[in-house]
Amino acid sequence: MTTQVALVGGTGSLGRIIHGVIDQLDGFEVRSVLGSASDLAEIDGADLVVDASTPAASIDVVRAAVERGINVLVGTSGWSQERIALVRPLVESAGTGAVFIPNFSLGSALGSALAAAAAPFFPSAEIVEAHHERKIDSPSGTAVRTAELMVAAREAQGPFQAPHVDQRARGQQVAGVPVHSLRRPGVIAKQEAILSGPGESLTIVHDTVDSAAAYAPGIRLAVPFARDARGVVVGLENLVDIGIRARS
């Protein structure tokens, strides 16, 4: 039986990549592509909703899917732990699945997990992320997820040291981690998680140079997983065994 997919935001750059991958997946078919002017009722009849819309629209997409008893895969940025908490009770009450993937790149997920693994051993951490000038939101969903994972890993050690955070130039605080966002031409996506301690520092860098090639393997994993998921799952690192299990 073919799984019918409603793709929201399918005309954007990520949406087009997802569409191309689904077209190559056995047992899946994109039945409808929704844009910014579409009525969300067009997801009716789908077996799975894939959201590649905008941070502002994404929460309505998730709610519309859950209210209809349809599982949803979210690739849109802007989903912090606080925002996910707003829809978690709805998902659990409906008995559906909502899978949030801040970044479909396996390398990016591994970089975030490595940063979390290193976090207990360094008292200071900051994140620098750079994206192309067309990316609307900042900090990126990947940076937010990385910061949240790093702080969660330091439960026994307490928060990171982050001096002078009252100054705007010190970046935006995400879970107590300063995050610095760059938006400029000539770059697709790059993140540096910089951990520091007395006499040393560790920098974990991930650089995307081809979005379609980098995201395709993660999309191929996430789409079938989301179809069968129950409850809320956050992060590609929870779909594969990379030896480091993160929190949803």
Across the structure, where does each feature detected by a protein language model lie?
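Hydrophobic beta-strand scaffold residues
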Residues: 30, 72-73, 97-100
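Rossmann-fold NAD(P)-binding glycine/threonine-rich loop
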Residues: 76-98, 109, 114-117
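C-terminal substrate-binding/catalytic lobe of Rossmann-fold NAD(P)-dependent oxidoreductases
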Residues: 4-43, 56, 123-248
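Short, ordered loop/turn segments at secondary-structure junctions
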Residues: 35, 77-79, 103-105, 130-133
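Rossmann-fold NAD(P) dinucleotide-binding segment
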Residues: 48, 56-75, 86
